[in-house]
Amino acid sequence: MRPEKLDAAAIAEHLHKMEGWVLAEDGGSIWKTFRFKTFAEAFTFMTQCAFAAEKLNHHPEWFNVYNKVDVTLSTHDADGLTELDFKLAAKMDQAAEGRMPDHM
């Protein structure tokens, strides 16, 4: 079953509840940069997120350099954002809890 694309109001409602996630200019994806104390913390975060992504069968676009992980989420099958993107974003936020320095 193809995921249903969210409308602008639903996207805004989700984003209002989430810290640090930004809607792309074209409205088709959300992104966030996670910064950790060390590379090991970043890698642990990515590993935990990979397991969550597999369970959801929804995979992020991400880029890692040392302690920084840039994440972009969208649902290509829906050509935009779906509930899956926000579910995975929430799982990523949970995985990052307690791992990121307070000042970043």
UniProtKB/Swiss-Prot annotation:
| Catalytic class of the enzyme | lyase
- GO molecular function list: 4-alpha-hydroxytetrahydrobiopterin dehydratase activity
Which pairs are disulfide-linked?
none
A Gene Ontology biological process term: tetrahydrobiopterin biosynthetic process
Q: What Enzyme Commission number(s) apply to this enzyme? A: 4.2.1.96
What Pfam families is this protein classified in? Pterin_4a
Keyword vocabulary terms for this entry: Lyase
Under catalytic activity, the entry for this protein gives: (4aS,6R)-4a-hydroxy-L-erythro-5,6,7,8-tetrahydrobiopterin = (6R)-L-erythro-6,7-dihydrobiopterin + H2O
Q: Which HAMAP family match?
A: Pterin_4_alpha
Family membership: Belongs to the pterin-4-alpha-carbinolamine dehydratase family.
The record's NCBIfam families line, in alphabetical order, gives: PRK00823.1-2, PRK00823.1-3
| Name of the protein | Putative pterin-4-alpha-carbinolamine dehydratase
Q: Gene encoding this chain? A: pcbD
